[in-house]
Amino acid sequence: MSGSICKTAFAVLAFGLSAFSGSYAEAASRFMQTGAVTSQPIGHYQFCQIHKDECSIISENSGPARVTDFGWNVIKDVNSEVNHKIMPMTDQDIFGRDEVWTYPTDVGDCEDFVLEKRRELMAKGFTVSNLLITVVRKPDGEGHAVLTVRTMDGDFILDNLDDRVRLWSETPYRFMKRQAEYNTGRWVKIENSQDVLVGAVEK
């Protein structure tokens, strides 16, 4: 084989590997990689003492949901409607103490929005293993809670600070931990949040 042919073949191979690597990384960034079991947020622990039946659901991991166009409309509507019908207010202002997780009526903190969205989506047929309470840190370092919806297209975020439903890797947050899809009372670490943040900066 001549040198020019070898160089051409090598260039084609290198391009192919680069394209594969890029597409693989892009696909991987659509899904959170979870790791070891970690600590349960104190607010969720206290919530579970009241709502024991909601925190002891064991699920067979059937994989992320296949969401139809109608299903996406339901997800977007629930996110927007809950964001607009509940007035944001801190636990300190409502209860005089921090980390009170509860179903809201007219006011609530971020985790209360999450609980309500989760409850409404479950009532509309979404499985609990694909609706996961998730703890993140905002760019200023403040803790925050969002709802992760696991789908075959990626992990999407419902956030009381944003009416859009966005892929988790397109949000400005550092993802810390979330409920385990197999047990509503267990929490697991999110391993690839830093990788996604670095990738977003490099784009």
Language model features with spans:
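Bacterial N-terminal signal peptides that target proteins for export
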Residues: 1-10
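A structural boundary/capping signal
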Residues: 24-203
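Bacterial N-terminal signal peptides
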Residues: 10-19
